[in-house]
């Protein structure tokens, strides 16, 4: 009997990069735990050996419970991909502080909640991979991105910090930092001016990355031997200048 491949857990798996990652890892024969709020969108992927659970990443207990149920079925988590994120753009003096809280909760606490759910077990087993989807906005600043950049700089920092902590336990921590990608990410930004500006920018670049390109980088990093940690991958449209 062929040994089943390792379980991959993906947050924000209902659309965009998370959905593309689910399809890419499924095509490689991995069982999947897909986590997002919109369960029907995840089930619509119709992927073999996949479990879709409606989980808000800010709910640590729900995340731990979902992971435990998937591990009962598919064995221990081989790779966790913290991909769920929100981007709410606005000027610092005008933006609703509730939007800052939402971003900090999802983009930072959500990632930490995911890590907390699997890390002790990975250390005990002396193997495992955690891939955190950050952003180029975790490396440099952009207009109207103050709080978003704060959350993504946080993701870069915590990933590298934990990487050093768990390196001797043979656990890999990977940061993927995409530039502009074709997803629903911008759809919740409230300012129409900012949305229009983004659309114009996309046109100047002649299009943006497809989510599949980001998914391929995750597969690449994961499929390296366990003694090779691809610490960070930065990818963007060739014509994206900043």
Residue ranges and their predicted role:
Residues 14-15:
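Conserved glycine-rich cofactor-binding loop
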Residues 54-65, 97:
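The beta1-alpha1 cofactor-binding region of Rossmann-like NAD(H)/NADP(H)-dependent oxidoreductases
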Residues 135:
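Residue(s) in the substrate-gating loop at a strand-loop-helix junction
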Residues 175-176, 196-237, 241:
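C-terminal helical subdomain
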């Amino acid at each position: 009997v062929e040994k089943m491949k390792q379980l991959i857990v993906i947050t924000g798996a209902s659309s965009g990069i998370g959905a593309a990652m689910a399809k890419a890892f499924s095509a490689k024969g991995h069982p999947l735990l897909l986590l997002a709020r919109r369960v029907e969108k995840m089930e619509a992927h119709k992927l073999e050996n996949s479990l879709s659970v409606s989980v808000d990443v800010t709910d640590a207990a729900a995340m731990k419970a979902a992971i435990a149920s998937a591990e009962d079925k598919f064995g221990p988590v081989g790779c966790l991909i913290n991909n769920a994120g929100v981007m709410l753009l606005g000027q610092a003096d005008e933006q609703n502080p509730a939007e800052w809280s939402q971003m900090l909760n999802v983009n930072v606490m959500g990632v930490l909640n995911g890590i907390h759910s699997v890390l002790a077990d990975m250390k005990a087993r002396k193997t495992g991979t955690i891939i955190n989807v950050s952003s180029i906005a975790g490396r440099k600043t952009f207009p109207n991105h103050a709080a978003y950049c704060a959350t993504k700089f946080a993701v870069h920092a915590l990933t590298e910090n934990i990487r050093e902590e768990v390196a001797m336990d043979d656990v890999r921590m990977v940061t993927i930092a995409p530039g502009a990608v074709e997803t629903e990410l911008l759809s919740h930004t409230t300012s129409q001016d900012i949305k229009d500006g983004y659309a114009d920018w996309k046109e100047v670049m002649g299009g943006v990355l497809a989510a599949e390109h980001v998914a391929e980088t995750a597969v690449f990093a994961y499929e390296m031997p366990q003694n090779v940690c691809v610490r960070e991958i930065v990818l963007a449209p060739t014509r994206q200048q900043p």
